Amino acid sequence: MFGFNKFLDWFSEIADRWDTKGVKFTLYTTIAVVIGGLFELIPPFFLTKTVTPISTVKPYSALELAGRDTYQREGCIGCHTQMVRPFKWEVDRFDPTKAYGRTGYSKGGEYVYDHPFLWGSKRTGPDLAHESQMLRSDEWHKNHLINPRTVGGVPNSIMPAYPWLFEDSHKIDVEQVVSNMKALKAIGVPYTEEDFANAPSLLKDKTEGQALVAYLQKLGKDSAELQKGMK
């Protein structure tokens, strides 16, 4: 106890001494904060990547990217997550076919080309990170988007219907998609000039609904391909 009191007396003496040297104390504190801040802020500028891409993961095609834009615009992220957490019950639910082997949860490398990522935080509807492995056809997805209450076995579903996405009045804006691809290339997504040149033919006469279906069928597909190659 005596030793502790002695320490407090010493500390109090030091504090009193610095109280009389406010300018110097402020200067030293500022220097310490700046040095600490530099150690925190400078290293990230030299990091080209923080996650190693999964070898089978490829950038979205023009049609899939258009569908992703529609997904964001319609607010799907407000009700669906895109990240399977590393819990057994969650993996069992969202990887029923065991397409991802023993580790069926989401990996960082699956999202390297997502700008922004669409993990979400609310599951009013199911997680969609591995939707491609639910083995649902394009026709199933189309009918589900047109009327969620007649497809999927949930007659009281609160999911909105999106029939207009498949109408001719909602054709894909080709120029906008190509512009988006070029912007993504500028931040590191490996699109090529060939991708830009082929986009108009891939998107010709396609509706936003068709694009959204293509996007849903892409989710989790590439990372599942890696597991197939390991079998």
Name the predicted role of every residue range:
Residues 29-30, 34, 92-208:
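Electron-transfer interface patches adjacent to heme c in soluble/periplasmic c-type cytochromes
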Residues 202, 207-213, 228-231:
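N-terminal targeting pre-sequences for secretion and organelle import
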Residues 1-60, 110, 184-191, 215-231:
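Post-cleavage N-terminal segment of exported redox proteins
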Residues 48-72, 84-94, 99-102, 124-126, ...:
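Electrostatic cytochrome c docking/interface patches
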Residues 71, 143-148, 212-219:
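Bilobed periplasmic-binding protein/Venus flytrap-like ligand-binding cleft at the lobe interface
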